[in-house]
């Protein structure tokens, strides 16, 4: 894939939120949700969030072709991508640590405490120590956090109309 336009690179580097339009696994209808992400500086982003099961993860596992939409800055872009749910702990952990580190850079976040904790977890992993004490608790959180790796599959498209597409309405009994 060719290099992304400079304004899109800036948007992905400075943003914390992105919208994804995917196909629902049961009904086959489109769904647009707003998610948190981290861009790798190339053609991939990692989606994650609070621990727990998420419908959007199941939708992307069943129908991996998605469209990402920038939301925080203009100009607005639509980017076709292919999703892959990352399930292996050893593969997930570096993605999740980088995601949390990016998220900790957001204004108003208690960065010092989070960065200290992340440094301790990274040291624990580098030394191949067991997941004991507070690290056991951290591992349980990391194991329950969603982790979806998206690879851009086509050229970003500058959106003709202002703003990203609207979010889908919540379904009965779902957030």
Feature roles, as predicted:
Residues 1-30, 167-175:
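Short, conserved active-site entrance elements at the starts or edges of catalytic domains
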Residues 11, 38-39, 141-142:
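Extracellular/periplasmic catalytic domains that process cell-envelope and extracellular macromolecules
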Residues 51-134, 142-144, 151-156, 163:
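Short, structured beta-strand-loop surface elements
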Residues 32, 160-163:
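A short secondary-structure junction signal
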Residues 15-50, 66, 78-80:
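Short beta-strand segments
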Residues 32, 147-149:
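Conserved hydrophobic/aromatic beta-strand scaffold that supports enzyme active sites
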